[in-house]
Amino acid sequence: LADHNARAAAGSRVELSIAVLEKGSEVGAHGISGAIVDPRSLRELFPDKFSAIPFEAEVGREHLWWLTQEKALSLPEPPQLKNHGNYVASLGKLVKWMAKEVAALGVDIFCEFPGRTLLYEDTAAGKGRRVAGVRTGDKGIGKDGKRKSNFEPGVDIRSQMTVLGEGPRGTLAKQLDSRYGLSAGKNPQVYALGIKEVWELPQGRFEPGEIWHTMGWPMWPDHFGGGFIYGMQENFLIVGLVYGLDYENPLDDPHLEFQRLKTHPSIAQLLAGGTMSYYGAKAIPESGYWAMPKLGGDGFCLIGDSGGFVDGQRLKGIHLAVKSGMLAAESIFAAALAGKPLSSAGDAYPVHFESSWARQELWKSRNFHQGFERGGFDAMVNAALGTITGGLGFGLFDRLPAEAGHERLRR
């Protein structure tokens, strides 16, 4: 869309006004450092500037460990976990670089503008109401809920098309789901907690781009998840744990399990003499294709985690989030070229997704997470048979049912 505007400025087309609302104090404020990025969508988005993207390093040495409480057994990586050709990246650095690129093309970025509620208006055909923009949150509200001297009321930002990339369980996306039933007939979305720490270690402890993934202790066989360690530049190391929130025991503590993971002899040896610099955590939508909500409608699109664009089998979602944004933009661009209302792109966007490589990737892992409801051993069998059969559950079923995470909790 920004490229369309650049050409429109030359007089060939009507220019569109594009704005990004960022709830953080700056772009990247909510991006937790350290991730492995499949570069496919970024190569498509920045074909002439790909070499300028500030990745930390291309993935080099890869390790997969099966952990017992005292030992680390090296395993061969299954196809889904092989990362040759992928990159270790700081998500904060990546999105800041992208923000500069789009700002240079005339996109307005407004930081510290959280969306509080959606705006609606009657459709021209009189067949209901469409999304017509966002009302931002008030500023200058005290802890007691009263207005302070610096109070500023929220503003109404009207738009023909509203694209929501709020992450999992976003405020506005939940409003849309409640109003339009976007998740009707879908599997329930199940979440995991991704916990990360950034460590600064002595020189020579690891190579930038060196990565580890762990299975087994301290979670096996009752919990979905595993550990990860990524080597970055300047002796910084990412260590983290993905912990499924669909556990049965109400006393489970994901943060405590992460601390236990770091006491494993092989990991403790890696971290010895280092300093923990940063900490963060975020929710991850893990249920896959069958839990994705309806992705668009009159005046709106859902992208990234808001739309469930995560491949749990590959442990990746950034490239899918980028591709979902591209598909939404292409749908809006097509509506503009055809002289149609931009709001109509919300219906075209899901169709474009279904014919994209992003859909093909998510289709292959459509039954991956459901296998973990039956325990770790069944999950491994399901994953292996799904790989052979193109994603069939246990090699037989096109769609495995799923339980919401809270329904599995013992009371």
Regions found by a protein language model. Name each.
Residues 11-16, 308-314, 326, 330-379:
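Active-site-proximal substrate-binding core of FAD-dependent oxidoreductases
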Residues 26-33, 39, 44, 57-93, ...:
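Redox-cofactor-proximal catalytic regions of oxidoreductases
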